[in-house]
């Protein structure tokens, strides 16, 4: 496809392509994985890899398109908002889609090292989860946010259980807790949507932004209840205290590539909080409690990391700590804290994905155990040892990597605010606790395990490529901190200036078509 044709395609159908591509790939992979022909089944990894890397290229093009500042709305089925399904691409949505694609490529390459073959329909579930994630980041109405949540959750249930042998019982127990929590969250989500639709007659986020400020006094309380229910649901997804207890066991039980992909899952909840508080309800709906709960989440995650007895459990608490930091930035609500939070979001997602892969490689080098106890080291631990140092520096917020830059930007922006001293103390204390936890883990794994055991299998090319690739992305983020922080600053400004998003969604007009079903329905009505 030549340049002008590609530009036309992106300008016309850009927001829907990240949803359609994994949907079609997942459907095709489901057929191929179910085929009896071995020749057809051999195509499965090639189709999955092609679709995932094509998504990465598409996401990069969409980011370039969104960087200009224009919000692009897409009317599914050509029905105008707020009556039809609307998708919208802005700077934040484009960033999240690109980050999802980058993590997906890393996880898939690692899975191609052998883990994808340990269960049924891995590749199809993987693509359907990408569809749900991208749809959640691009939808412009709350009901379809619910739909995409259910799609990604249904796929994640299967991915969590994926795998055979060691850890299967642990995965099953974690899956029961995970499903129970998320089913309860889905029920609350539906109740909140019913309340909102009952008082406003719409679930389109741009339309809600218009209608909520002019509600009759009798309906305001119902809308506030709906807002709190929605924030509760998103707090479950984002692992905010006291609703984060499902996450450590779930993420620790997942296989390495699934855990790496799950690194973006908590960010869906953070994204939803950002979107509804800046666009629909206003920051004041969460201001009384979000920052305080985020600080408490950060504190307990640091304690959990210090108390962890397994490396995968430690990594899971690092994910909770990053979610607390991001929600702290969202709760403070200024443009500076939001910009810093978005920059930190990129680093924390990439580093979390790296840690899940790294924990698996370290366990392999130690005979399959991730217990933080001295054990004989097998061969093949040079790559995990070097990667451990880079990942530890990145996640703890130590110079010169991007974790330090993100936290420094957050502290700089939060300093003048009323909660500034608490934010500074909480972030610095949690960073110190994470450094201590990682130093303890590193000393146990690499220094106290001086005895050399039987040689462990070397990392496969796929495993080494995936781990090196994601760590290279972490290093590149630090090297390109200037332009990336400029982009996240622009994305934060666009979030707070919501009128552009509202105008783009409600002002989108259906494209002319040769056959218009609405016109035909009107003509039939006139004829009668």
Q: Residue ranges of each PLM-predicted region?
A:
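Short helix-boundary/re-entrant hairpin motifs in multi-pass inner-membrane proteins
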Residues: 174, 224-292, 316
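Alpha-helical multi-pass transmembrane bundles of energy-transducing inner-membrane proteins
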Residues: 32, 40, 44, 122-218, ...
């Amino acid at each position: 496809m030549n340049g002008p044709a590609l530009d036309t395609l992106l300008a016309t159908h850009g927001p829907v392509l990240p949803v359609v591509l994994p949907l079609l790939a997942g459907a095709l992979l489901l057929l191929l994985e179910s085929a009896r022909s071995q020749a057809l089944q051999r195509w499965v990894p090639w189709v999955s890899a092609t679709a995932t890397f094509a998504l990465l290229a598409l996401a990069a093009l969409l980011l370039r398109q969104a960087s200009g500042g224009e919000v692009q709305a897409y009317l599914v089925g050509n029905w105008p908002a707020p009556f039809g399904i609307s998708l919208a691409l802005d700077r934040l949505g484009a960033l999240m889609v690109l980050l999802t694609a980058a993590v997906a490529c890393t996880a898939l390459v690692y899975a191609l090292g052998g883990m994808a073959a340990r269960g049924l329909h891995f590749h199809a579930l993987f693509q359907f989860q990408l569809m749900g994630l991208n749809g959640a980041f691009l939808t412009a109405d709350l009901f379809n946010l619910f739909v995409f949540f259910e799609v990604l959750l249904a796929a994640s249930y299967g991915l969590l259980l994926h795998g055979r042998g060691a850890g299967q019982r642990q995965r099953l127990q974690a899956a029961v807790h995970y499903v129970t929590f998320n089913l309860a969250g889905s029920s609350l989500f539906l109740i909140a949507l019913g309340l909102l639709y009952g008082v406003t007659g719409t679930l389109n986020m741009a339309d809600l932004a218009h209608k909520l400020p002019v509600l009759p006094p009798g309906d305001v309380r119902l809308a506030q209840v709906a807002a709190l229910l929605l924030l509760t649901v998103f707090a479950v997804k984002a692992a905010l205290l006291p609703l984060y207890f499902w996450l450590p066991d779930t993420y620790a039980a997942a296989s390495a590539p699934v855990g790496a992909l799950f690194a973006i899952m908590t960010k869906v909840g953070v994204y939803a909080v950002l979107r509804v508080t800046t666009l629909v309800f206003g920051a004041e709906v969460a201001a009384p409690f979000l920052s305080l709960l985020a600080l408490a989440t950060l504190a307990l995650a640091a304690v959990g990391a210090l108390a962890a007895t397994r490396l995968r459990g430690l990594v899971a608490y690092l994910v909770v700590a990053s979610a607390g930091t991001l929600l702290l930035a969202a709760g403070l609500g200024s443009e500076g804290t939001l910009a810093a939070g978005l920059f930190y979001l990129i680093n924390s997602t990439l580093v979390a994905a790296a840690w899940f892969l790294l924990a698996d490689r370290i366990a392999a080098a130690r005979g399959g155990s991730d217990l933080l106890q001295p054990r004989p080291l097998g061969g093949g631990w040079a790559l995990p040892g070097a990667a451990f140092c880079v990942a530890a520096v990145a996640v703890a917020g130590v110079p010169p990597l991007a974790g330090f830059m993100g936290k420094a930007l957050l502290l700089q922006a939060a300093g003048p605010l009323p909660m500034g001293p608490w934010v500074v103390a909480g972030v610095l204390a949690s960073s110190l606790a994470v450094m201590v936890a990682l130093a303890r883990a590193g000393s146990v794994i690499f220094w106290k395990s001086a005895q050399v055991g039987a040689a462990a299998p070397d990392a496969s090319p796929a495993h080494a490529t995936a781990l090196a690739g994601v760590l290279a992305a972490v290093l590149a983020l630090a090297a390109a901190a200037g332009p990336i922080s400029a982009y996240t600053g622009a994305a934060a400004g666009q979030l707070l200036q919501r009128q552009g998003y509202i105008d783009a969604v409600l002002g989108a007009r259906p494209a002319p078509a040769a056959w218009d079903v609405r016109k035909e329905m009107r003509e039939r009505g006139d004829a009668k």
